Structure formats: structure tokens, C-alpha cells
């Protein structure tokens, strides 16, 4: 007990683990739950070389399983193909596709281990990544409050659990919509912003702008706001002295602005 009281790293870690377990339980303890397809999934599926499990689209019904195209002579050739986009359908780009491709690789490896059809895609692996990202954000937020009195830490933990782990948010994790990436990347931005304010370092600032890029690309309507945030983030340069540090902040801001602007330029006419 004394160790728990004195070690400031324990409670953020325990809190993040609880967030992970609770979020996973909400989605997969009992009947699997998620959001139905309103017709938007097809566009995402085509770009990522995926398709519905059968000929019936089942719009407005939640679907757990899909099919992914797998091509290649060997294991690594297939992994490489899973990370590629459909050039014929690549009409827009989004960092959401990075998360989807990662979940495809996880599905493929799991299918190999369990001797299942290698083309089977279970959306639970996508939800797993989102839950992991949310838990990481929780860890960052809890770490920021690690120096506060225990009552404050418990209050922050309970607020996070009852507000940000609500089933209404978590349901989106079992879908191909952009909202779950928007949600978890925003939470990571908040966590990193707090940690940067407390102890500014270039790695944290670089991660902040990576999260901002994911937030911008999760919903293209976020792009203009993200450009503004990237410019305002120049204020990070005043949180710590040092020429190299400030140059690093400036480089991060410029790179983020360029990448986010490129996202804006890629917005299709529709």
C-alpha cells in the first residue's frame, strides 16, 4: 500500500488498464454492439481493398465481419498488399486508412494463427486499436494529475470513466466512420497538451502534431481548425528556453501545417 501511495506511476497505469478493460467489456461482454452502415462504409471499404461479407449490404444493421482482399506469393507479400490502397478507388486520402490497414494486418496474423480464412476481417481488431489509443490518452491525462492529492486523482479518474467511456462514444469504435478516430485523437491531443504544459519536450510536441494530423484527417471538416491549432501551437516555444528546442517547435509546426494543408487540398468535390 505504501508503494502505491509513493509511486506516482502506478495510478496512471492502473487507471489506463481499467479504461481499456471497461471499454472492451462495453463492446464485447455479452452481445457484440456497434453502429450500422448508413451507406458510407462502402467508400471506405473500396479504398482499402475490402468488401461486404456477402452480396447483401445490410444497410442500417450492425455487421461484425467483412472480407479483405489478400494477394501475394508469401507471408510478407501479403502483408505488403494489405497495407496498400486500391488505386482505382483512391479518390481521397485519410489517416483513418492507416488505422484500418493496421487492423487488417492484425486480422490476417490472427487468421493465420487460428487457421481461419485469411480474408476474414473482424471489426473488433479496429475497435481494439481505438480502445488502445483511448487508454493511452487516459494514461497521459492521469499522469498529468499524478502530483495532485489523491482525492483529485480519483475525481479525474471517475470523470473520465463516466463521461469519456460512455457507451454512446464507444459504439463508434465498432464502425468504419471517422468519428472514433476523431474522438480518440482529440483525447490524445488533450493528454499531450497537458503533458507538454507540465514538461515540454520535442518528442511530446512531435507526437502532439501527429495526433493533430490524425484529428484533421478523421473528418475533413476538421482540417481548417487543425491548421489554426498548429499555428497557435507556436506558443509551445515559450514554455521552455533553448534555441534548439524552439527551432524544433518551429519545424514541427511547419511540417504539421504542410501535411494538414495537403489533406485540405485532397478533399474531393463531393
Model-derived features: positions:
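Extracytoplasmic loop-helix module adjacent to an early transmembrane segment
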Residues: 25-108
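Hydrophobic transmembrane helix bundles of membrane-integrated enzymes that assemble
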Residues: 1-31, 96-270
Amino acid at each position: 500500500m505504501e508503494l502505491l501511495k509513493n509511486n506516482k506511476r502506478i495510478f496512471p497505469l492502473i487507471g489506463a488498464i481499467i479504461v481499456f478493460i471497461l471499454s472492451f467489456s462495453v463492446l464485447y461482454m455479452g452481445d457484440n454492439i456497434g453502429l450500422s452502415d448508413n451507406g458510407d462504409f462502402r467508400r471506405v471499404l473500396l479504398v482499402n481493398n475490402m468488401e461486404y461479407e456477402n452480396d447483401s449490404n445490410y444497410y442500417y444493421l450492425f455487421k461484425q465481419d467483412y472480407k479483405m482482399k489478400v494477394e501475394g506469393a508469401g507471408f510478407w507479400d501479403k502483408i505488403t498488399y494489405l497495407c496498400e490502397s486500391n488505386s482505382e478507388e483512391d479518390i481521397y486520402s485519410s489517416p483513418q486508412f492507416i488505422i484500418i490497414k493496421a487492423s487488417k494486418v492484425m486480422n490476417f496474423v490472427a487468421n493465420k494463427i487460428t487457421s481461419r480464412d485469411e480474408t476474414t476481417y473482424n471489426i473488433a481488431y479496429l475497435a481494439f486499436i481505438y480502445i488502445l489509443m483511448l487508454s493511452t490518452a487516459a494514461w497521459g491525462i492521469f499522469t498529468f494529475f499524478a502530483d495532485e492529492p489523491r482525492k483529485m486523482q480519483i475525481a479525474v479518474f471517475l470523470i473520465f470513466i463516466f463521461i469519456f467511456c460512455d457507451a454512446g462514444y464507444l459504439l463508434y469504435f465498432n464502425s468504419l466512420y471517422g468519428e472514433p478516430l476523431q474522438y480518440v485523437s482529440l483525447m490524445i491531443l488533450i493528454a499531450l497538451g497537458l503533458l507538454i504544459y507540465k514538461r515540454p519536450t520535442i518528442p511530446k510536441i512531435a507526437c502532439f502534431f501527429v495526433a493533430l494530423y490524425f484529428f484533421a484527417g478523421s473528418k475533413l471538416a476538421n482540417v481548417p481548425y487543425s491548421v489554426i491549432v498548429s499555428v497557435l501551437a507556436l506558443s509551445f516555444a515559450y514554455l521552455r528556453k533553448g534555441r534548439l528546442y524552439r527551432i524544433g517547435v518551429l519545424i514541427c509546426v511547419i511540417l504539421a501545417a504542410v501535411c494538414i494543408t495537403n489533406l485540405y487540398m485532397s478533399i474531393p468535390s463531393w
